[in-house]
């Protein structure tokens, strides 16, 4: 992140896009806690450092050393942090579409996060999702009610450039899976089906090469 601040106009446009995401039963179960206070950010950063160390203990060298070398947060450097939350009580206990699959509420919040991310990119704003954190620390520091769930902690700011590939793909931590390896037809792990021949062939050619 650079030191350039995000204008209020741009931040409002980004939040507007996030708030217009689709949601189960039109429940709009999200809230956006905006954070720029350095004292709060320092405490969140400390939580990251603790959880980061714990995570590193789950792997052995040389992977451990590689993991510890990655830049996985920009809490202090980014001018704006946003905690996106899920409130299951909005509009009462009955929400159309959530009775059979309660998790649809959190999935709706993820739609808002995706909208926020895309809108930020459109405005030339970089975004990092920090998930190496304690939700208990977030709830305490942000004074979230007991029933409200922190879903994402986002760092936003201007960046010097946008990479063409995700960082972890670029450094070889994990590969980008081919589309053909994640699409099944009609049944789990069924890789061929006569009813899907055309799309099957298109997918096998690799979408990145299609014009």
List where the protein language model places each region:
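Glycine-rich phosphate/pyrophosphate-binding beta-alpha loops
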Residues: 19-25
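C-terminal helix-cap and adjacent tail motif
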Residues: 153-211
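Generic N-terminal amphipathic, Lys/Arg-enriched alpha-helix
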Residues: 1-4
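Glycine/small-residue-rich phosphate/adenosyl-binding loop
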Residues: 28-109
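Short secondary-structure boundary segments
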Residues: 86, 132, 158
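Small-aliphatic-rich amphipathic alpha-helix that forms the alpha element of a beta-alpha
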Residues: 14, 18, 82, 95-141
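A glycine-rich helix N-cap at a beta->alpha junction
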Residues: 52-60, 144-168
């Amino acid at each position: 992140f650079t030191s350039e601040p995000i204008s209020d106009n741009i931040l409002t446009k980004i939040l507007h896009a996030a708030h217009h995401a689709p949601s189960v039963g039109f429940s709009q179960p999200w809230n956006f806690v905006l954070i720029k206070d350095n004292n709060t950010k320092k405490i969140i950063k400390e939580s990251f450092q603790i959880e980061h160390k714990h995570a590193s203990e789950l792997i052995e060298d040389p992977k451990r050393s590689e993991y510890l070398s990655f830049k996985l947060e920009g809490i202090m450097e980014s001018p704006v942090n946003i905690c996106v939350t899920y409130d299951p009580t909005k509009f009462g206990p009955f929400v159309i579409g959530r009775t059979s699959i309660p998790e649809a509420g959190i999935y709706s919040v993820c739609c808002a996060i995706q909208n926020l991310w895309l809108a930020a990119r459109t405005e030339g704003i970089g975004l990092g999702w920090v998930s190496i954190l304690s939700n208990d620390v977030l709830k305490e520091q942000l004074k979230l009610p007991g029933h409200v769930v922190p879903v994402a902690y986002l760092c936003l700011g201007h960046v010097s450039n946008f990479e063409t590939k995700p960082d972890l793909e670029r450094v070889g931590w994990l590969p980008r899976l081919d589309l053909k390896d994640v699409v099944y037809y009609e049944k789990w792990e069924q890789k061929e089906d006569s009813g899907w021949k055309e799309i099957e062939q298109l997918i096998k050619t690799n979408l990145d090469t299609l014009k």
